[in-house]
Amino acid sequence: MNRFFRENNIFDAPRTGGKGRAKSLPAPAANSPPSPVRPPPKSNIKPPTRISPPKQPMCTSPAKPLEHSSIVSKKPVVNRKDGYFVPPEFGNKFEGLPAYSDKLDFKQERDLRMHFMSDLERDIMKATLKFSTNYIMGYINSKDMRMTGKFASRPVKYKKTMEHMSDSRCTTCNYRFKDNTREWFLYVVVHIEKPLDDPDRIDICCQKCYLYHNVPKTSYEIYPSINLVDLSYLARERFFYQYIFPVSLEHTTEVKELRIDDHNCKVFEIIRRIIRNHKEPNERIQTIDLSTTGGLVLRETYTNIVLQRYRSMCTRPDVVDDVNCFILQEPSEMMAALQDNRFSGIKGTVFATVKVKKFTQVLDGAITFPLKPTTNNYCKLCKKTKLYYKNPVLYCTKCGFTNVYHFPEYSKFMYYFEAIKSFEMHNEMIIYYDLKMYKKLINIVNNNV
C-alpha cells in the first residue's frame, strides 16, 4: 500500500493539479518572497531556436476532461484548458473582428475615457500585449510584430506562408513557455545597475523568476495586462523600439479652453465632440472640466488605463469587445452625470477646459522589443553583417528582426518612414534603412528650424 502512495505522489501533489485550477490562486504580490531555487547562470541559457508552424490551429474551445480515467498523470499540470483562468490562445478566435467599443462613433452611452489616450500609447500597448500573448503561448512571431499597429491597415508586403518564428523562453531560468507548466504571467524585470546597451539589463521572465528577482520597483507585468502608467518607465528603459530605434515618450503639456453653446443638455455628446474635434492623434487628454457661469459641474479624469487580455480573466468571452480590452477601474464622472441628470437643467453656455499631453514622436514603424542576441541568425540575403550596401538591415522574412543591440551606433538616429526601403530575392525580403535618404531628411529638418 505504501508503495502505491509513493509512486502516485498523492501526498505531495501540487495544489493546482486535478481537473481544474484552484480558484484561490492569487495574482503574484510585489513583496512575495523569492523562490528558493536559484536560476542557472546567464552563460548557460540557450538562445531561442527557430521553430516550425503548428500543423493544427490553436484550440479555441475548452477541452473535455477525461471521465472515469484510471491514469494518474505524474507531470504537474498547472494550466489546464478547463482550469480557472481563460487560456491565452482562446482569444485568437476573435482576431480580425471589429470591436464596437474601439469606435468613437458608436452611439451607445458608455465610458469614453479609453479614447483619451494618444495613438502612440494605444499602439504601443496593443503591440506589447500581442507580443506577450504569443510569448506566453511559447513562440515569438515576427510577422505578427510587423503587422501590428498602423501596418495592419496598410498594403504591406509579406509572405503568404510563415515568416520567422522562434521559441520563447524565460531569460532568467530558460523555461520554455510552450511546455505550459507555469502560471500565465509574464514580466519585464529591469536591472538598473547595468548600462542601457547591455543585453542583460532587461529580463523577460516567468512568474517564478519574477518572485526570485524580488525587485517590484523595476518589474512590470506585460501579461495578462499592461498598465498605461508603466509605459513611460518602460520607454525610459528602452523596452520599445521602432525596428532598432528607441521609442521616446517625451511630451509637452497644453491647456485648451473651449466654449460650447449647442449642447442640448447631453453631456455624453459634449465629451464625444471634444474628443473628435479638439484632440490630435499625438495628444492624450488628462482631464476635461465642464463648467458654467455658476462654477464647475463635472470633471472627467483618470489615473490609469489597463489593457487586459480578457475583460474577466476567469470567464470565457463571448464577444470581441471582451478580448484585448481597455479597462478603467475608477468610476466615470460622466456616467454619474448621466444617472443623476445634472445637465438636464443647463440651458446656457458650457465652458470646457481640456488638459492634454502632446507627444513629440510619431509612431510610424513596426514595434519591436529587446530580445537576447542569438548567434548565426542570418542568411545569404541579410548576411552576417546585417548590412545591405552599407545600409543597416532592419528585418528579414527568413531571420526576423535585427536585434536592437546589433547597431549601437544607430540608437540615437531619428526614425523616418520615408527612409524605409525593401529588397526581394528568392521569395524572401529584407527591409533596410536608407542612410542617404536619412541624411537628406535630417538636412531638411535642420534647415527648417
UniProtKB/Swiss-Prot annotation:
Q: Where is the protein situated, by its record's location annotation?
A: Virion; Host cytoplasm; Host nucleus; Host cell membrane
Which InterPro entries is this protein grouped with? Baculo_ME53
Assigned GO CC terms: host cell cytoplasm; host cell nucleus; host cell plasma membrane; membrane; virion component
GO MF terms on file? DNA binding; zinc ion binding
Its signal peptide is: none
Keyword list, A-Z: DNA-binding, Early protein, Host cell membrane, Host cytoplasm, Host membrane, Host nucleus, Membrane, Metal-binding, Virion, Zinc, Zinc-finger
Tell me if Zinc-finger is a UniProt keyword of this record. yes
User: Which Pfam families does the entry mention?
Assistant: Baculo_ME53 (PF06061)
| Predominant location | virion
* Role this protein plays: May act as a packaging protein or as a structural component associated with intranuclear baculovirus virion assembly.
Identify this protein by name.
Answer: Early 53 kDa protein
Q: Which gene encodes it?
A: ME53
